[in-house]
């Protein structure tokens, strides 16, 4: 429903890069926030909002590699084969470890062990990333480890990644690593790896996941006050990346909001990402949700069939600019004066502080 208007905001593609010297820290923060959203929407990592300093295990990294590949569409929930003595078929990431091992993206240890709970190092991770890009052992001659790392640095896969080869990676490092992967050209095609997952690059060379967000975004859904969030999405909310009113948040924070407020959510099942908007919470600008009863529907004097705005019982005017919203509130649509609705709006303010609300979506009570 109404996905094209929403996808750009969900994907977070509007981040700008600060260029003034005294804005360096802000620029870095914005860049990381953008990367988190892209990697989350791409479905590579389940939760890009919390635990960013937590080390990533070899089992988790194998799962990330598979989810960053075309094998993601064939990843079974359980594995029927155990390829390592310390990875039983019942292990959480057994299927991903099997695929990663079969594709030679990541290797085990002597004695048939994988050591799934051991933290992944940059050198191990680099092997997997280069393999996804189409590089094999034949590309690196006899000095495999050093040649791989040289290629890794040459491709600038270490951008925003300040680790030595033998250092372990945390979740923040992996966000940067996989974002860099998406920007890097595939060995044989010369096209950005992002295209493998249905993304593309913007004109400035950054990843634009708009296609993924547009295709897989579900919603809006109105989560009633005091409800269980898990009843509204088809995945474990505690493993999700969560954004509240456009900012990175957490399950506990969203749970707290739902306990006392109505909340509108959108979600991407592939990426396990939730975008939530707290109803009637004041925001300076950007996306917001408003609940109320429709009091008036206004039409243009030149076109009495096409509504241009509505008012709710709060007295505020809400503009209708898209054809979908105009149809929904027209005589042909489903909304009438007196109906209870929740509007999802884009709020902007002029230099005088006067606010304008434009309706981009709605939920009928």
Give the predicted meaning of each segment.
Residues 167-172, 177-179:
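Structured, solvent-exposed acidic/aromatic patches
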Residues 2-34, 40-62, 66-93, 103-123, ...:
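Feature responds to low-complexity, polar/acidic, surface-exposed segments characteristic
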Residues 301-311:
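Short aromatic-glycine-enriched beta-strand elements
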Residues 247-265, 326-344:
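Short nucleic-acid-contacting surface segments enriched for D/E, G, S/T with interspersed K/R
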Residues 316-324:
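A short macromolecule-binding patch
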Residues 268-286, 347-365:
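OB-fold/S1-family single-stranded nucleic acid-binding modules
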């Amino acid at each position: 429903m109404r996905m094209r208007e929403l996808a750009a905001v969900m994907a977070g593609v509007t981040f700008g890069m600060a260029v003034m010297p005294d804005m360096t820290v802000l620029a870095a923060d914005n860049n990381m926030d953008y990367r988190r959203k892209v990697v989350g929407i791409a479905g590579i990592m389940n939760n890009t909002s919390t635990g960013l300093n937590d080390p990533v295990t070899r089992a988790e990294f194998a799962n990330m590699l598979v989810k960053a590949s075309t094998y993601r569409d064939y990843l079974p929930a359980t594995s029927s084969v155990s390829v390592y003595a310390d990875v039983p078929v019942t292990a959480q990431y057994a299927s991903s470890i099997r695929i990663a091992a079969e594709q030679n993206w990541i290797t085990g240890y002597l004695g048939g062990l994988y050591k799934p709970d051991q933290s992944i190092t940059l050198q191990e991770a680099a092997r997997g990333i280069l393999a996804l890009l189409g590089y094999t052992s034949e590309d690196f001659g006899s000095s495999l480890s050093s040649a791989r790392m040289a290629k890794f640095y040459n491709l600038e896969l270490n951008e925003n990644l300040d680790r030595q080869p033998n250092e372990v990676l945390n979740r923040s490092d992996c966000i940067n690593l996989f974002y860099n992967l998406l920007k890097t050209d595939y060995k044989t095609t010369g096209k950005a790896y992002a295209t493998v997952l249905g993304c593309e690059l913007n004109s400035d060379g950054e990843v634009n996941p708009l296609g993924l967000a547009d295709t897989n975004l579900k919603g809006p859904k109105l989560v009633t006050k005091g409800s269980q969030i898990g009843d509204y999405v088809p995945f474990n909310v505690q493993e999700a990346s969560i954004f509240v009113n456009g900012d990175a948040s957490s399950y506990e924070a969203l749970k707290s909001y739902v306990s006392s407020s109505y909340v509108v959510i959108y979600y991407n099942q592939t990426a396990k990402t939730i975008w939530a908007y707290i109803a009637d919470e004041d925001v300076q600008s950007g996306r917001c949700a408003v609940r109320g009863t429709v009091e008036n529907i206004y039409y243009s004097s030149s076109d009495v069939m096409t509504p241009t705005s509505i008012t709710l019982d709060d007295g505020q005017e809400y503009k209708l600019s898209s054809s979908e919203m105009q149809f929904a509130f027209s005589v042909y649509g489903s909304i009438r004066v007196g109906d209870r609705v929740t509007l999802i709006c884009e709020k902007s303010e002029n230099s005088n502080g006067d606010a304008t609300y434009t309706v981009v979506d709605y939920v009928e009570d």
